[in-house]
């Protein structure tokens, strides 16, 4: 089980990323625009640097949706590999069966 503070900080980062997503996308488009001038690119670069650090989506950590485990995540299910195995054995995941050959 992850610390509650780590889980809460990650949730706060998700909110910040969502809040600044449109502005960040607009600045990124201006940054790579082939028709833009050097001044507009420099202004876009400065604008991105002025955004909060946590506005970058790369800072959000994928965590287990139940207990917040940060590693071994199966993104398709939103849970960790340990929890996935337990839930699959108990039959709580529809359509998931243990392979046997």
From Swiss-Prot:
Biological process, per Gene Ontology: translation
InterPro entries registered for this protein in UniProt: Ribosomal_uS14 (IPR001209), Ribosomal_uS14_bac/plastid (IPR023036)
NCBIfam families: PRK08881.1
Family per similarity comment: Belongs to the universal ribosomal protein uS14 family.
Name the UniProt record assigns to this protein: Small ribosomal subunit protein uS14
Keywords (A to Z) from UniProt: Ribonucleoprotein, Ribosomal protein, RNA-binding, rRNA-binding
Residue span of region Disordered: 36-72
Gene3D superfamilies hit by this protein: 1.10.287.1480
Gene it is expressed from: rpsN
GO cellular component, as recorded: small ribosomal subunit
Pfam annotation, one family: Ribosomal_S14
Regions of compositional bias (Basic and acidic residues) in chain numbering: 61-70
Subunit structure, as described in the record: Part of the 30S ribosomal subunit. Contacts proteins S3 and S10.
Function: Binds 16S rRNA, required for the assembly of 30S particles and may also be responsible for determining the conformation of the 16S rRNA at the A site.
An example Gene Ontology molecular-function term: structural constituent of ribosome
């Amino acid at each position: 089980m992850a610390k509650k503070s780590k889980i809460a900080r990650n949730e706060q980062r998700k909110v910040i990323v969502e809040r600044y997503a449109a502005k960040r996308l607009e600045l990124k488009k201006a940054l790579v625009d082939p028709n833009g001038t050097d001044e507009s690119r420099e202004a876009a670069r400065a604008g991105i640097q002025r955004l909060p650090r946590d506005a970058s989506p790369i800072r959000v950590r994928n965590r287990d949706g139940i207990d917040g485990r940060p590693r071994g995540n199966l993104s398709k299910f939103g849970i960790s590999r340990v929890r996935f195995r337990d839930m699959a054995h108990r039959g709580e995941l529809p359509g998931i069966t243990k392979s046997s050959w």
